Design a protein with these regions (language model features):
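Aromatic-lined, polymer-binding surfaces characteristic
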Residues: 1-28
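Extended polysaccharide-engagement surfaces of secreted carbohydrate-active enzymes
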Residues: 25-289
Length: 289
């Protein structure tokens, strides 16, 4: 489950509950693996990456508060110092959102003292191939690289938040860059997208004579897609790639396009509201741009 602030913690809690009531401790292994992975989704300020979600929390700011129950439970069961450290971090950064009073009343074992902290990772580069996502953390710098997502890159540094880098081309109405693949190669992260844009020719006389294009479905609509029946010509192709390289917490994005010439391109840098940009020119008649 890719929803980091809603459904992932719900699934963890459900598995823990079933494991306890049905005496099936093997179910906890999936919870452990999820909690270990989620450690690498946490920004320095305690917020969690939501860009990869397919649910309502996508691109929303969220804390780790809903994970508190799961991390505390497994920290106590396993004596896991990293899980205990993350519990204490949640207590510092997301205390107002923790809603675990009922759990402490029904499960007195949660009242036991947590194990001693073990260091949480603050310097890493992790590629999660199933999620087509890479996470890089260098101290106070935190970056996310994503395929299958209109946000291809996001970055945090202290209180500054570049919440999304996106780019699009004016290519047959389908030019919003959403990478098909994420390739990790020699310290670089390469996102790729391949597009085709055909021109559709009129139906042939034989196709019209058969009348297939005018057959109606029971609901009164055309039963066939006439565009799919039309011959294509002058098929245009556009290959787009973004290579992200990192050195000591500094990132370079190289965007390249090959194929159809003279295609307009727009690149968007979406910063979190509230900061102040310098060295830029405002876009006339466009708010916050």
């Amino acid at each position: 489950e890719k929803s980091t602030t809603v459904y992932s913690p719900i699934v963890n809690r459900a598995l823990i509950t079933v494991a306890r009531h049905l005496q099936r401790p093997a179910l906890l292994e999936s919870v452990r693996r999820n909690l270990e992975m989620t450690i690498f989704y946490v920004h320095p300020d305690g917020e969690v990456v939501t860009e990869a979600s397919r649910r309502q929390d996508r691109y929303q700011r969220g804390s780790m508060a809903r994970y508190y129950y799961s991390y505390r439970t497994l920290a106590l069961i396993d004596g896991n110092g990293r899980f205990a450290a993350l519990c204490r971090q949640i207590e510092r950064t997301g205390r107002a959102q923790i809603g675990e009073l009922a759990a402490f009343l029904t499960e007195p074992a949660l009242l036991r003292a947590l194990p001693a902290d073990a260091p949480l990772p603050t310097d890493y580069a992790k590629h999660f191939s199933y999620s087509t996502l890479a996470r890089i953390r260098r101290g106070s710098a935190s970056a996310t690289i994503l395929a299958n997502n209109t946000t291809l890159f996001s970055f945090r540094k202290n209180s500054a938040a570049l919440e999304a880098v996106r780019f699009a081309t004016a290519f047959f109405g389908k030019g919003q860059f959403t990478a098909d693949t994420l390739e990790v190669r020699a310290g670089s992260y390469i996102l790729r997208q391949s597009l085709e844009g055909p021109y559709f020719q009129p139906l042939s006389a034989a196709q019209i004579a058969l009348g297939d294009h005018t057959k109606m479905a029971p609901n009164g609509t055309l039963a066939t897609n006439s565009k799919a029946m039309r011959q294509q010509s002058n098929v245009q192709r556009l290959e787009a790639s973004v290579e992200v390289t990192e050195f000591s917490g500094k990132f370079t994005l190289a965007i390249s396009l090959t194929g159809t010439a003279d295609v307009p391109v727009s690149i968007e840098l979406a910063f979190r509201h509230g900061g102040k940009l310098t060295g830029v020119e405002p876009v006339s008649r466009v708010p916050d741009a």
